[in-house]
């Protein structure tokens, strides 16, 4: 188990002793002997990650993944437009000692040490860096896949874990069309099904579909829209809470995550829903979360608990500033944690979410959030509060 950093206050240290939970506890039943509902619980680690070197700071942090070594990869937007030039990046602007944007790809270990940092546009490079980084996924062999949701971003890039360019998937700058087999439409998130040698694109901010490509080559394989329909970019996708959702994805199509048991979970963010499919696009079911949420929607990204059965889903809700703990069998919310705020354990637009092999959760925040947070797995506990804010030790609230 990873050593836990010394936290402020004796009570807080004592509360973290419970972190000595093992992987076996991840597979405890959902219902305790007392018939209390049981679910994974978490405490925020306020000292993770460690400060970045070189006066680096993060911009909008819009992707996170954990690789086979339990290294955490985050992608953020480090372009000048993401910051207040004089106030935030005075070193970059040449007017102050601090600060300057960090490279867009950041790799951390479990303790929060920065292991590597790379990426960004390079003059004369054989690739076109996304105008707006969006989403990151690390393959079992260490290859890093990166999406983009900027104006011309109709492609996905693949690099080695050290930032060496491998390939471009799709045609950069091509006209976007949800029925195209050669280009994509501002891909939001990327997920890998290594058992099938396939990669799923949540495609995306312009396109309204799930697209699947070959893991080894990037070759296009198949795609589908909401309910398994053929995508129609001209369809009415109006969403009205309490009424049936549109027959096409409203978008952005913000996640497409394959599970271990042969299902694919798709976030249709603007319609507050998660739709479940077979890998061939056959529709299975739909589940609505916080259906009164308008504006940017409630279903931003999901991660599975790391047990083999993936008993739980963790849903990032960037409009309501919280994380939902969902029983995957019933797709019911067991409880939520978080709220709006700047302190550890609170959120400003939680955008992406991932888990490591120990059961810990990692979240990123976009807009003015501009950070990544770690939530330490505390084992299975009875659900006594349905809405927790924030995830601090009880005696510190």
Regions found by a protein language model. Name each.
Residues 4-397:
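Eukaryotic scaffold repeat domains enriched in small/polar residues
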Residues 1:
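Acidic, glycine/polar-enriched metal-coordinating patches/loops
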